């Protein structure tokens, strides 16, 4: 019976079929412990371990390496199955942060370039090749609220007073967009032109000419741009808008519409969502072309995506929505909502590192978390306690943060 995978279970006082556990971890040479008993370690060439002939019950699994945070989880071993934990990354207990610049008030990233504003109200451009000043303090608009990279050509500077400027990096100058004011919202890029909403109508302008063109014949509640198409919500209808002359195309109905609510319509990883009052999430089920209510939050709902996964979060909750079914022990069906974690403290910002880990701030403290919600989440501190902005460059694997007015970059965090 032993050769057939059976062992005698003293607790049950009978022979049972055994199971196993398969782990795969980074970096190399990590040590595996099961119920505090050392089992084996990985090598430089083989980063996985398979342990067989375990009785079916729960075990405390621990992966550790000197100088790194350990990974620990209580996992169930089942008969005739190998429980998997194959997306384990151990993070250093002390990460090196390189200082890029000090006395920085904000930064605004876009792929491999970052614009940052210092405390003297000067604007700089950071690239891997170095730092260049774009504007001095007399050229920078007052009270900058946000800088958006709508395209390489269209970089929009928004002020808290409702003024908008077009930023020309190469020529180091700004131009006031006179068509925009404090009531302008939902600015999108389309073929290097700006599509925006003003008084519930949709307009398009070439920002270099600043001459608006009306696109929508009737009022809309919200709109978005996907593949250069304008998709709008008008009361209970989702329509495709072409221009003022061509007839609109009815796409879907939204039966939950309420005249007293505000709406956003967004595509996330090519899936269509409606966000109601910044709190309630609806998802378009393309099998029956109806909108399903997925999340009802008590606070402002935000999101960040990574290929076929979306993290939604508010001030205290994080949810995961997989957009396809994964062969993973902790994922459910595609388009389900998985409660990752509820916190007593405030979740400020989240950025994906890869499909299995994300970096986030909790009351401005910087952390990394896994998405494997079996047992307890493994959450690792990066020892920064005043982080107000984070950006992870997926191309270079560099993490940039603004911590206590210092613009910093970490060493490589993930393989």
Task: Give residue spans per PLM region.
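Ankyrin-repeat and related helical/solenoid repeat scaffolds used for protein-protein interactions
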Residues: 350-397
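Blade-loop segments of beta-propeller domains
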Residues: 93-103, 134-154, 160-162, 170-183
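Short, aromatic- and glycine-rich surface loops/edge beta-strands on solvent-exposed regions
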Residues: 60-64, 231-234, 400
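Surface-exposed loop/turn elements that mediate protein-protein interactions on large endomembrane-trafficking
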Residues: 120-139, 159-180, 197-217, 235-258, ...
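Blade-level signature of beta-propeller repeat domains, shared across WD40, Kelch, NHL, RCC1
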Residues: 386-415
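Hydrophobic beta-strand positions that form the internal "hydrophobic ladder"
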Residues: 114-115, 155, 194, 230-231, ...
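Short loop/turn and low-complexity linker motifs enriched in small/turn-promoting residues
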Residues: 1-128, 156
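Repeated scaffold domains used in trafficking and secretory/extracellular systems
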Residues: 101-107, 141-149, 181-192, 216-228, ...
């Amino acid at each position: 019976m032993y050769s057939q995978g059976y062992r005698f279970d003293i607790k049950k006082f009978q022979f049972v079929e055994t199971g196993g556990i398969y782990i795969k971890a980074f970096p190399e040479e990590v040590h595996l412990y099961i119920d505090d008993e050392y089992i084996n370690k990985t090598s430089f060439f083989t980063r996985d371990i398979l342990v067989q002939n375990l009785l079916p019950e729960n075990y405390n699994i621990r992966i550790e390496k000197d100088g790194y945070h350990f990974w620990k989880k209580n996992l169930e071993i089942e008969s005739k199955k190998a429980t998997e934990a194959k997306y384990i990354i151990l993070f250093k207990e002390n990460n090196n942060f390189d200082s890029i610049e000090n006395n920085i008030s904000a930064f605004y990233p876009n792929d491999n370039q970052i614009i940052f504003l210092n405390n003297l109200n000067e604007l700089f451009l950071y690239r891997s090749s170095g730092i260049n000043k774009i504007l001095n303090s007399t050229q920078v608009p007052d009270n900058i609220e946000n800088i958006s990279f709508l395209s390489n050509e269209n970089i929009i500077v928004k002020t808290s007073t409702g003024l908008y400027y077009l930023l020309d990096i190469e020529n180091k100058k700004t131009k006031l967009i006179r068509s925009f004011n404090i009531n302008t919202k939902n600015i999108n890029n389309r073929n290097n032109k700006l599509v925006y909403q003003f008084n519930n109508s949709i307009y398009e302008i070439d920002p270099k000419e600043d001459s608006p063109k009306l696109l929508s014949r009737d009022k809309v509640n919200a709109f978005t741009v996907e593949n250069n198409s304008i998709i709008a919500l008008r009361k209970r209808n989702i329509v495709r808008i072409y221009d003022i002359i061509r007839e609109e195309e009815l796409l879907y109905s939204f039966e939950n519409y309420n005249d007293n609510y505000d709406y956003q319509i967004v595509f996330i990883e090519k899936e269509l969502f409606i966000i109601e009052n910044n709190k309630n999430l609806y998802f378009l089920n393309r099998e029956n072309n109806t909108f399903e209510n997925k999340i009802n939050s008590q606070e402002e709902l935000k999101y960040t995506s990574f290929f076929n996964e979306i993290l939604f979060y508010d001030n205290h909750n994080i949810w995961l929505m997989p957009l396809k079914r994964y062969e993973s022990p902790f994922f459910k069906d595609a388009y389900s909502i998985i409660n990752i974690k509820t916190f007593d403290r405030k979740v400020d910002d989240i950025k994906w590192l890869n499909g299995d880990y994300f970096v986030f701030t909790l009351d401005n403290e910087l952390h990394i978390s896994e998405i494997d919600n079996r047992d307890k989440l493994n959450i690792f501190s990066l020892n920064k306690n005043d982080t107000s902005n984070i950006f992870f460059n997926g191309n270079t694997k560099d993490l940039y943060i603004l911590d206590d007015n210092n613009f910093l970059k970490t060493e490589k965090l993930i393989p």
